[in-house]
Amino acid sequence: MSDRQAALDMALKQIEKQFGKGSIMKMGEQAERKVSTVPSGSLSLDVALGVGGYPRGRIIEIYGPESSGKTTVSLHAIAEVQRQGGQAAFIDAEHAMDPVYAQKLGVNIDELLLSQPDTGEQGLEIAEALVRSGAIDIIVIDSVAALVPKAEIEGEMGDSHVGLQARLMSQALRKLSGAINKSKTIAIFINQIREKVGVMFGNPETTPGGRALKFYSTIRLEVRRAEQLKQGNEIVGNKTKVKVVKNKVAPPFRVAEVDIMYGEGISREGEILDMASELDIVQKSGAWYAYNEERLGQGRENAKQFLKENPDIRDEIAFFIREHHGIGEDSAPENMEESTTLD
């Protein structure tokens, strides 16, 4: 053994003695080669994320205009974690959580931990305590803009508090990032949009809370309404685009299109139908949709209703979509015919 190797071994032993076993290791020893994920609750978004869902132990920022579907996207993630037997927490800084709507999206509100903090410091300290416990699988902070520093709440209306929230977020993320990674917690920060004053060229839109969250986030999702969905003259929902603006675990800039139906959340049938039509798993002839020579319905809404009433066929189509994109989370449905294959 060379003197250099002996010196390195001695240094490694001292580091492990001082900071504990596993504090330093060779990258290939115990590091996870494949990113561990939890489904987002939307097949289209799972594909856009490139790894089949939200990566564990990472920070995710979801931002967009008002009523675009940010909280809906987050609640679907909570429902998926709970479906897998995980524990979820929701820091409701906006004090606007609707338990009835959350329940309709599949969230078990009896098991969901909810906090409605008075100040930004309180909300972030509660989040840190939950993450450090190691018992939380997903935590959602709604929203960064509502994490108001204590000094601002206790001050007068006209007082100036320049950069106070940005400093608060910067300090909190420095403390949180390591704990989030070690505990394998998915931390979702919901954020709003503001406009910079006096911007003549380029995008005037920005997100509050400073730049720290942009840097610490593994994934940043931009949620925007694209168009209204109508049934006759009645507006029943919105077609929403979710753009992956930043992604450290897969190629970014992919876009997921989902139907967010009022009172129901993301329409699983709508995205499955659209994706299956693109891949020619479901054949579209005129206004008719067909699968394995079986007609699903005339028009998109009727075909969606057919898939809703026939979950076996819906799950079978979803399996082939996942298989095509290489993000197989679902196993093949038991009643799937062996002859059914994806070309």
From Swiss-Prot:
Keyword Ion transport among UniProt keywords: no
Main subcellular localisation: cytoplasm
Presence of keyword GTP-binding: no
Localization in the cell: Cytoplasm
GO BP term, example: DNA repair
Keywords, in A-Z order: ATP-binding, Cytoplasm, DNA damage, DNA recombination, DNA repair, DNA-binding, Nucleotide-binding, SOS response
InterPro entries the UniProt entry points to: AAA+_ATPase (IPR003593), DNA_recomb/repair_RecA (IPR013765), DNA_recomb/repair_RecA_CS (IPR020584), P-loop_NTPase (IPR027417), RecA-like_C (IPR049261), RecA-like_N (IPR049428), RecA_ATP-bd (IPR020588), RecA_C_sf (IPR023400)
Protein's job: Can catalyze the hydrolysis of ATP in the presence of single-stranded DNA, the ATP-dependent uptake of single-stranded DNA by duplex DNA, and the ATP-dependent hybridization of homologous single-stranded DNAs. It interacts with LexA causing its activation and leading to its autocatalytic cleavage.
Family: Belongs to the RecA family.
HAMAP family registered for this protein in UniProt: RecA (MF_00268)
Name this protein carries in UniProt: Protein RecA
Source organism: Bacillus cytotoxicus (strain DSM 22905 / CIP 110041 / 391-98 / NVH 391-98)
